């Protein structure tokens, strides 16, 4: 235990590649760390509007920010997700976070990610992908070009 009464959690340097895509989506300015501005921008894409509360954003940063620099680096992000029980499978991760990612990507709110949804989001996130790569993602997720990808399919794409 630290003198402050907090428990020290060692941060590993072995990155879990399953969390990298989620981190890159939330890191909207692509500077390698998640800031309060990144979270505001991320949650602005979710139709409910309730998730951009400043107190909640501050809490999210402070919970994950192990080195107290005001940002969440990938290793800190990874540590939070690895220690949070995955409500569906127990594999480690945050189902709620992934649902938020899904909502941001689902532009028309129909509960499925279409080819257009995936292409649009990848472009807006600065991730250069070809049409064939988008089609491969849809196939990997168990979807097709007509029906798109479900939430569970998105988890397959991210390797969760």
Swiss-Prot record:
Say if the entry is tagged with keyword Calcium. yes
Q: Name all EF-hand domain ranges.
A: 22-49, 52-87, 93-128
**CDD domains for this protein:** EFh
Pfam families (UniProt xref): EF-hand_7
Gene Ontology MF term list: calcium ion binding
Q: Name one GO cellular component term.
A: cytosol
What the entry lists under PROSITE patterns is as follows: EF_HAND_1 (PS00018), EF_HAND_2 (PS50222)
Q: What is this protein called?
A: Calcium-binding protein CP1
């Amino acid at each position: 235990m630290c003198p402050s009464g907090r428990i020290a959690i060692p941060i590993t340097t072995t990155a879990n590649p399953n969390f990298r895509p989620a981190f890159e989506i939330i890191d909207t300015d692509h500077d390698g760390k998640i800031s309060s501005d990144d979270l505001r921008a991320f949650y602005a894409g979710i139709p409910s509007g309730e998730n951009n509360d400043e107190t909640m954003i501050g809490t999210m940063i402070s919970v994950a920010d192990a080195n107290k620099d005001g940002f969440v680096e990938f290793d800190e992000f990874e540590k939070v997700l690895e220690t949070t029980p995955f409500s569906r499978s127990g594999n480690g991760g945050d189902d709620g976070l992934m649902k938020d990612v899904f909502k941001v990507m689902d532009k028309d709110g129909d509960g499925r990610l279409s080819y257009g949804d995936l292409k649009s989001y990848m472009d807006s996130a600065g991730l250069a992908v070809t049409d064939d790569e988008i089609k491969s993602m849809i196939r990997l997720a168990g979807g097709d070009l007509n029906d798109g990808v479900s939430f569970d399919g998105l988890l397959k794409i991210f390797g969760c």
